[in-house]
């Protein structure tokens, strides 16, 4: 038996093929463009992601089953009839809805959101992004009026286009702030609060099941990438935990059959997976910019100064080589890093990275309890 594991992530799409003997090999990995039309906005082209997924499927060869891991909170709109995108994929890092989130918080809405979804009010989650799409994009409003609007996270669009199935799994739905965590269904009050038409959202399913076929091959699992990592690392018992270091860094700890709410520490209640209708819960703590926070040297490599660095000597220019040695901040990196903090998720500016050439600090960091 050969199984293709598709991982559609924030910066790349890859496919790993696992065989019955336990061997596993990455067959193909493809990077995609990051779009920043305004400061704090982060978008992907859904058609580029879909094309990369299809190329990965072709590279996997003949397999017996397919699994799909997705970005989680990244979301979009599309036409139910044509399948064409009506919006870009708004990435989880995107913070365009922060003013709206602040207004909701000032109105006292956070208590309801935390109680129902397990998540705090934050632009990170899908709810406010989907509401923004409905409010600001004319194509989405026209589709809504015509009864053709579909809204969802990236997995729902991939499943719709690849399998003809308009569905999402419960782990992904739990990251939207629109799902009632205890009941595993879309919450009408939360949808109304964020301005998201509940009838436009996908069916919520178990993590493992029949999601349709791609060609003649069944897609039998769909899950958020971080939860996939938790399961893949063999975590099964309450207290088992893992930390994944990628674009962001995310810690997940299993809590088993119990939903553990710990708002005073900033840890979020979520679902790790659900099989045969039985949910397994977890606690989540995340840092939005981990490897993303140190990608700026790659950008600097494009500068004339960087191109002229003598590679053979290993020398680096001093800060005097730069027009200003004062630290600056990348205007496209205002997503910030978030981490569990004693009274919620706190945000404080990070000092410039200490390198011999220190032109900017890409990320923000958070004060965590000691």
Q: Where are these predicted regions, by residue range?
A:
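N-terminal glycine/serine-rich phosphate-binding loop of ATP-dependent small-molecule kinases
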Residues: 1-87, 115, 206, 216-221
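Residue-level signal for inorganic ion chemistry
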Residues: 22, 45, 66, 94, ...
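Short, function-defining helix-loop hinge/capping sites that tune catalysis or transport
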Residues: 15, 53, 77-78, 87, ...
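Short, acidic/turn-prone active-site loops that include or flank metal/cofactor-
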Residues: 30, 35, 90-97, 247-249
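Short beta-strand-loop/turn "lid" adjacent to the catalytic site in phosphate-handling enzymes
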Residues: 58, 62-92, 117-126, 155, ...
